[in-house]
Amino acid sequence: IAHDLFNGTLGIFEQGYDPYLSLWDPISHWMSVEQALYAIVDRPEFVREMLSRMVRGYLSMLDQLEEQGLLCHHQSLIHCTGAYTDELPSKGFDPKKPVAKDIWMFGLAQMLTTVSPDMFDEFEIEMSMPIFERFGLVYYGCCDPLDRKMKQVKKIPNVRKISVSPWADEEMSAAEIKSDYVYSRKPNPALLAWPEFNEDEVRKHLQATVDVSARNGCPLELILKDISTVKYEPTRLSRWADIAMDIVGG
């Protein structure tokens, strides 16, 4: 059906499975977030064993996907951002049988926002490392502010993009990211939801991001996401995009 609709306009091709391998999102369904956070303190061995079993399960799933040639390849997106790179696919790539080293993965642990950097390192970064290392490249983060946990995120050897959410301190984030990673900024979408669309506020907000990334030599991308409403004015989206392009010199 897609081929019939878009033939001649868009290239249509079959794709395999694009893995989403979060440890903590499934846990939030099995236990409440509150119970899981208490368990880290009260039952750390239980939590470590639960995470270890999940990691073993994910790695086994990847083994099966690779063996059967069911993984995706040539991703256009990785967790709402462009999957642009000249580092992938890996050497020896076989489009009929792609492997995890040919593609991006994304990691996140939003429910660990309130834990210390050391706990984040122990229960997320170190536990997830076998999964991270299995893939070609890693995009890390979502809505969780990582400004005080950048040192831990940077331990991931193949991380290339790091999320800078609306709740993150941009100065701290940029000082850690520098030119080593993509500064994947998620500007505040609330500016599109006000009763009156204030273009000056949008410009000020975006300019601050461009300035801090420029001062620290950060490669920058702007990702507008998590939009709740545009107050029945979809033109706010195009105006936001126009302002962003004007600021970055596009």
Describe each region flagged by the PLM.
Residues 1-250:
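Active-site loop segments of alpha/beta catalytic cores
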